[in-house]
């Protein structure tokens, strides 16, 4: 909300070529995406099992490079993850700066930051309460949008004005109608990931004694239960389901770190059970990506894209 207009203005001082602007945005996005992937990889074994590779791939494609079409939110997501994961796991105070940076990119991350601050106040010692809340959140199917509007009346006026579109009943009906018009794959590929995340998080919670004493993973588990739970409930608000997928970035970070260690037979069976659900989402995500990428995207590279026009999507 602040960074994007500033970058547009700064780019316009030097060139009127929109490709230079996109190159700048893509470079920022690519930096944070690559750093986040490396952060996740550093938590696991050097030679991960096949399901570890699957978790990394899904993490990488939840907000993939073609999602830069939704520039502000996608960019803010990876900046926010970069800042908070450093703070959560390593107590790196620079994380606060990047979280504020994410807020300047997209105002709605004020909600995510509020949940993070709540977790810092409560800490990991309430993990049982987080888990109960997490389970309940899977069955919270409806919220009164008028009630939510009244609860945010204390916010600054510019925040309230921006949130009005998200809390509009007509907008919600349009989103529901759009979902109903999709085929089976379009309707359920996101739900399949939601339930896979729910099952795997529950599995880790049940076996959490294995990570007792591992403070980073204990914190990550407790935070995931709280963060996923909050946005399961808020996902009933139009466009807020985007934050469910922000929460899944943290969940898949935990999955990679936890399941790349020694796991028992029951845990392996649960992974095998969840794999089709995860693959369904992953394949559909790739399918959607084909609508935004062409051969020039895959073969040309950024420098060719600067001088070549007319790339055609593969689908």
PLM region descriptions:
Residues 113-241, 287-315:
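Alpha-helical transmembrane segments and terminal signal-anchor/GPI-anchor hydrophobic tails
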Residues 65-80, 105, 202-262:
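Membrane-water interface signatures at transmembrane helix termini and the short loops
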Residues 131-134, 263-283:
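Signature aromatic-anchored transmembrane alpha helix within multi-pass, membrane-resident enzymes
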Residues 37-59:
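Transmembrane-helix signature of polytopic, membrane-embedded enzymes
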Residues 24-43:
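Transmembrane-helix motifs of polytopic, lipid-linked glycan transferases
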Residues 63, 94-118, 228:
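Membrane-interface alpha helices of multi-pass inner-membrane proteins
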Residues 77-94:
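Membrane-interface transmembrane helices that cradle and orient dolichyl/undecaprenyl
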Residues 1-16:
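Short hydrophobic/aromatic helix or loop-helix immediately within or flanking a transmembrane segment
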């Amino acid at each position: 909300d602040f960074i994007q207009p500033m970058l547009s203005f700064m780019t316009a001082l030097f060139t009127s070529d929109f490709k230079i602007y996109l190159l700048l945005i893509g470079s920022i996005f690519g930096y944070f995406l690559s750093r986040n992937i490396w952060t996740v990889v550093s938590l696991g074994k050097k030679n991960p099992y096949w399901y570890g590779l699957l978790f990394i791939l899904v993490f990488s494609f939840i907000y993939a490079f073609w999602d830069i079409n939704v520039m502000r939110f996608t960019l803010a997501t990876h900046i926010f993850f970069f800042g908070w994961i450093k703070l959560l796991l390593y107590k790196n105070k620079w994380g606060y700066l990047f979280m504020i940076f994410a807020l300047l990119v997209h105002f709605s991350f004020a909600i995510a930051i509020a949940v993070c601050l709540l977790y810092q106040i409560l800490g990991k010692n309430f993990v049982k309460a987080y888990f109960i809340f997490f389970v309940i959140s899977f069955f919270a199917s409806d919220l009164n949008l008028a009630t939510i509007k009244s609860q945010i009346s204390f916010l600054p006026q510019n925040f309230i004005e921006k949130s009005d579109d998200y809390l509009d009943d007509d907008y919600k009906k349009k989103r529901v109608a759009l979902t109903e018009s999709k085929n089976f794959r379009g309707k359920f590929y996101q739900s399949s990931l939601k339930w896979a995340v729910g099952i795997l998080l529950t599995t880790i919670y049940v076996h959490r004694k294995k990570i007792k004493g591992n403070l980073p993973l204990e914190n990550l588990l407790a935070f995931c239960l709280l963060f996923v739970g909050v946005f399961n409930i808020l996902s009933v608000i139009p466009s807020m389901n985007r934050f469910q997928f922000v929460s899944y970035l943290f969940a898949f970070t935990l999955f990679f770190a936890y399941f790349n260690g020694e796991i028992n037979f029951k845990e392996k069976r649960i992974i095998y059970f969840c794999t089709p659900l995860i693959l369904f989402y992953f394949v559909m995500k790739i399918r959607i990506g084909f609508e935004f990428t062409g051969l020039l995207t895959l073969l040309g590279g950024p420098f060719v894209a600067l001088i070549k026009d007319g790339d055609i999507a593969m689908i």
